[in-house]
Amino acid sequence: MNFKKAGIFRRSSEGSEQPEVQNDSGGMLAVWGSPGSGKTVTAVKIAKMLSAKKKNVILLLCDMTAPMLPCICSPDELECERSLGNILAAARIGENLIKHNLVTLKRSNYLTVLGLLKGENEYSIPPFTEKQAIELLDGLRQIAPYVIVDCGSYIANDILSAVALMEADSVLRLANCDLKSISYFSSQLPLLKDAKWDADKQYKVAAKAVPHPTHRKCVGRYGKRITTTRETAEATAVSLVPIGGD
């Protein structure tokens, strides 16, 4: 899998069509979408899939309203408990600081996680800037070939998620097939209409799609879908680390 903008998913507009060659060079994928669309579950599954293929991957959990690390991985599965807040509190963010605060897992040699700990919130750390967020993302790129960013929905007040959407090689955009999601994107997409925002790097997915005329219209608009099945409905209960490890 390759999330690079110049990789297998990018359409070439120069000259005649050439057969695309897959280049497994990694990249940064931001998973973003409307509230309740399954962003974290999707990000976790992608990270687990890559680690199962023995690819070094970092999963960055941006949500500071409801920190997701305690939700997807129990404390006894962690080799250490370190916080994303320790990094963002630094005036200058370097590679060594990031490595020191990455959370490693007992049963996975290829997957590391970064996020806030249980009980922490955005007021647990000093205010940080766009520059610090960029330094963090650049540092993660240097440490691992694959970086999966689980973005929060409220990007107007979430600097880290907003910067990740700008800096990522590709964005997986999830939307539920309901009016709330339509209202959400009508409100939030104008915030991203900036010179730095590349709409071509988005891959739109209709999440939690079920057989229904309205949902079929939504799926037709987005092109891809995540169908609601028993497996996807139970996905939120799946631990980040499988019992058997990688």
Regions found by a protein language model. Give the residues of each.
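Extreme N-terminal, non-catalytic leader segments
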Residues: M1-W32
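Walker A/P-loop phosphate-binding motif and the immediately C-terminal alpha-helix
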Residues: V21-T65, L69, L140
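Phosphate-binding loop that captures ATP/GTP phosphates
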Residues: K53, V57-T112
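Short loop/turn segments at strand-loop or loop-helix junctions that form parts
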Residues: D63, V113-G119, T229-A233
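Cytosolic-facing regulatory segments adjacent to core modules
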Residues: E95-K106, T112-I155
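A short helix-to-beta-strand connector/capping loop
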Residues: T104-V113, D198-K201, K224
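Conserved catalytic-core segment of NTP-binding enzymes
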Residues: E135, R141-Q142, Y146, C151-T227, ...
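C-terminal boundary of histidine-terminating zinc-finger modules
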Residues: T236-D246
